[in-house]
Amino acid sequence: SCTEKTCPGTETCCTTPQGEEGCCPYKEGVCCLDGIHCCPSGTVCDEDHRRCIQ
């Protein structure tokens, strides 16, 4: 699981499919269900097309 110390303050921590901690390059980013992709705050993951939508 992620802790506040895992990633810099400008990034968001996401748990990978392997259960490890990964960093998303967006502040207050949204982790996608696949655990690989992430989206900027205010958007949602489009899992089918692997993109972020408003």
From Swiss-Prot:
Post-translational modification comment from the UniProt entry: Six disulfide bonds are present.
One of the GO biological process terms: neuropeptide signaling pathway
Pfam family name, one: Granulin
Keyword Acetylation attributed: no
GO cellular component, one term: extracellular region
Coiled-coil regions, chain positions: none
InterPro entries xrefs: Granulin (IPR000118), Granulin_fam (IPR039036), Granulin_sf (IPR037277)
Cell location: Secreted
Key words of the record: Disulfide bond, Neuropeptide, Secreted
Disulfide bonds: none
Tissue and organ distribution: Brain.
Protein family: Belongs to the granulin family.
Protein name as annotated: Pars intercerebralis major peptide D1
Species lineage: Eukaryota, Metazoa, Ecdysozoa, Arthropoda, Hexapoda
